[in-house]
């Protein structure tokens, strides 16, 4: 309870010790301010304040926000939580609730999530609900039961976040105020339903989609005149059986796009902003036809030939290298800023491919990783023909690397120092703890003092800060919600 009161004190700008010395200043505030303070607590914490005094007994009931975790309710969790929601909704008129958040604990495989469907249907229809969020604490492939939801016209809804929810079909839908929509492992009933959900949101700005393994959408159409940020994530590759085969994107105001675990056969961008930033972490491992795979990779990348800012993962670069001789990488003719990750063993060859594809590159940040997934023989040196960007445009390079057995990182530094005519800054970030390897004495000093093609180039060697979390610490898989 003390911690709760300290939260209150902090929310009004008074230190906890000062709060406890004097009179109860918080309780003297008017009801609407106290309710505003309680908004920053979960509903479970808010209910606890009812025992502070008679002044607080019923205040939690007037907070226009429900933030619930089913694990906080006594067994059977789903029965008691659903009953609590029903009782709360019946206490007040329909214009009261503004925000609803429900986290469903399915760790108990006896959970009955269908109990929530009636009350969720009531909440989503409330005329003044601005934030609606339903999520499960399990990963997609551990989910054993379905949470079904029917969307309807939601005139005030600004933020919609759903995780592991099966959407029922709908004939019409209107979301005139919706700006944020995160749908993670959500199953659409049809192509038309997915398209309608996006197109009926005329002010939508931020869209994140993670397709479920059971999704039946064949053609995913993302048509929006207002969308600014779009993230598309595929189901875990092992489970990617069904789902979209074609993606069409028509988003003229889009300034950020991220593709993760890509498994689509066709991806076409009709329109997007000239200043869009693209993050690519795509994977094609389920395909067996090399010709089709090669064309799909090329067609996907060709969509981004005009972007100016890009981040690309080693997963994607590995496929680019694999088919480079048969189908060269498209020219990223306007790309000036690039972040990339690559295998240290393949970096000498892959770096050449990347630089040759970016004739106007100015700023390059790349990370070397120690991965054993590159069985092909690779070159041990560079071509004498210099990429155009080294001669005319490259201004800054930042490389993060472990100390490798073959000192690959030093070879790359020498390459940039000796060949970059316009380079102004080169930074080598060394991770001294990852491999246990050490450079020969004096080698870094020699490198710092070595001649450079660009007289303006400043070269620095910095240590990567140690990771505060040991490798055995469990890291929760990245989620949208």
Swiss-Prot record:
Cited InterPro entries: F-box-like_dom_sf, F-box_AtFBL13-like, F-box_dom, FBD, FBL13/AtMIF1-like, LRR_PRU1-like
GO cellular component assignments: chloroplast
Record-annotated F-box domain positions: 23-69
Domain FBD as annotated: residue spans: 378-430
UniProt keyword NADP, yes or no: no
Domain of life: Eukaryota
LRR repeat segments: 126-153, 159-185, 186-211, 214-234, 236-261, 289-314, 340-368
Record-linked SMART domains: FBD (SM00579)
Keywords: Leucine-rich repeat, Repeat
UniProt name for this protein: F-box/FBD/LRR-repeat protein At5g18770
Organism: Arabidopsis thaliana (Mouse-ear cress)
Lineage, opening ranks: Eukaryota, Viridiplantae, Streptophyta, Embryophyta, Tracheophyta
């Amino acid at each position: 309870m003390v911690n709760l009161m300290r939260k209150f004190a902090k929310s009004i700008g008074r230190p906890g010790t000062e709060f406890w010395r004097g009179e109860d200043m918080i309780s003297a505030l008017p009801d609407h301010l106290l309710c505003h303070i309680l908004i920053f607590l979960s509903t479970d914490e808010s209910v606890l304040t009812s025992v502070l005094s008679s002044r607080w007994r019923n205040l939690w009931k007037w907070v226009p926000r429900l933030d619930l975790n089913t694990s906080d309710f006594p067994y059977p969790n789903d029965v008691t939580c659903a009953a609590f929601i029903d009782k709360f909704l019946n206490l007040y008129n329909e214009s009261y609730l503004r925000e609803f958040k429900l986290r469903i604990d399915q760790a108990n495989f006896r959970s009955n999530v269908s109990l929530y469907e009636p009350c969720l249907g009531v909440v989503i229809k409330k005329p003044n609900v601005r934030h609606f969020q339903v999520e499960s604490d399990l990963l997609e492939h551990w989910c054993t039961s379905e949470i079904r939801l029917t969307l309807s016209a939601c005139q005030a809804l600004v933020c919609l976040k759903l995780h592991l929810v099966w959407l029922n079909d709908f004939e019409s839908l209107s979301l005139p105020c919706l700006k944020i929509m995160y749908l993670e492992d959500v199953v659409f009933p049809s192509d038309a339903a997915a398209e309608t959900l996006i197109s009926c949101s005329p002010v939508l700005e931020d869209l994140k989609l993670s397709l479920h393994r059971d999704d039946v959408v064949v053609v995913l159409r993302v048509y929006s005149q207002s969308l600014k940020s779009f993230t598309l994530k595929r189901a875990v590759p092992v489970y990617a059986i069904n789902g979209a085969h074609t993606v069409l994107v028509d988003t003229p105001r889009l300034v950020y796009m991220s593709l993760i675990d890509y498994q689509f056969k066709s991806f076409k961008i009709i329109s997007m902003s000239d200043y869009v930033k693209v993050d690519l972490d795509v994977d094609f491992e389920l395909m067996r036809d090399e010709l089709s795979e090669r064309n799909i990779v090329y067609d996907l990348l060709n969509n981004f030939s005009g972007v100016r800012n890009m981040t690309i993962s080693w997963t994607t670069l590995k496929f680019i290298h694999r088919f480079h001789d048969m189908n060269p990488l498209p020219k990223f003719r306007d790309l000036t800023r690039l972040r990339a990750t690559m295998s240290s063993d393949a970096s000498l060859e892959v770096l050449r491919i990347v630089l040759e594809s970016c004739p106007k590159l100015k700023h390059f940040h790349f990370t070397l990783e120690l991965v054993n997934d590159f069985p092909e023989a690779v070159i041990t040196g560079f071509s004498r023909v210099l990429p155009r960007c080294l001669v005319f445009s490259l201004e800054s390079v930042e490389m993060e690397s472990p100390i490798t057995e073959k000192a690959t990182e030093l070879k790359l530094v020498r390459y940039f120092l000796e060949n970059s005519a316009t380079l102004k800054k080169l930074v080598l970030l060394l991770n001294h703890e990852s491999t246990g390897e050490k450079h020969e004495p004096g080698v870094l000093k020699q490198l710092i003092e070595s001649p450079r093609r660009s007289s303006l180039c400043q070269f620095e060697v910095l240590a990567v800060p140690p990771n505060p979390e040991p490798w055995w610490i469990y890291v929760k898989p990245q989620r949208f919600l």
